[in-house]
Amino acid sequence: MSVEYINPSTSAPPRGYSHVVKHGNTVYIAGQVARDRDGKTVGVGDAKAQVDQVFKNLEAALAAAGGNLSHIVKTNIFMTHREDLAAYREVRAKYMSNDNPPVSTLILCSGLADPDFRIEIEAIAIVP
């Protein structure tokens, strides 16, 4: 089985990593942050705007691998502000069903790669 490295044109070009690696039906998605396709941070200081951009980036990553958000089986969420949990849950509900949610780990941390980032989500998906 070959390994495919994918960097969607709708995402900011990565430096030193791939946004998506697909091996067979398994898709590994690098931590997605609130950057648009031009590399600009979206929603500085605005948790909802940042979570929304992260889910848009996850959608783009999965689409590039032939999948969608319903194919996610595992997420790791890194957040810098505990008070952003409600905003995260609210925005996540717009993108993901609660019928069969993926397994998930949420980690509160003191910071991410850019001090303006409030959230980062990495995922594993199984696509048909």
Describe each model-derived feature in a short phrase.
Residues 1-56, 60-73, 79-128:
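N-terminal presequence-like segments and the immediate start of the first folded domain
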